[in-house]
């Protein structure tokens, strides 16, 4: 990343198209949290396999893109529909060497913007049946406001019109 370009952590290959009419969908367990990923301590393979409380269950296919998952999350989460909201996706998978889970970042999408991760599929992210998807939803930051107005009050507006510096 020395030349200032954005580089994705997951390489996008070209997979064969999946016929959704013939292939049975799988159950995808998605866990969302605001401004952060769920703590790994909430994913516990002991004690009956506890998981975070904010679970969404979706039936989808391995060729489902991160943009499609974003749309499905927005259907059930009205706050996430705002332009500029960022969805940071990670896969939570069992660590094969121990009885715990590990979190692996796979990409992010933003409402109202196109991104390099939009068309990544679960298959390209190396998702396996039995894994979870953890999504950190970050609402756009609120700009400086005056009396609930983006541009300030009437006085501020008049001052900007008269100012020689624009």
UniProtKB/Swiss-Prot annotation:
One of its GO terms (cellular component) is nucleus. InterPro entries: SAP18, SAP18_sf. The keyword Transcription applies. The keyword Transcription applies. One of its GO terms (molecular function) is transcription corepressor activity. GO terms for biological process: negative regulation of DNA-templated transcription. Residues 143-166 are annotated as: Disordered. It comes from the Eukaryota. Keywords: Repressor, Transcription, Transcription regulation. It holds the Pfam family SAP18. Residues 147-158 have a biased composition (Basic and acidic residues). Transmembrane segments: none annotated. Belongs to the SAP18 family. Acts in transcription repression. Involved in the tethering of the SIN3 complex to core histone proteins. Interacts with SIN3 and histone deacetylase. This is Probable histone deacetylase complex subunit SAP18.
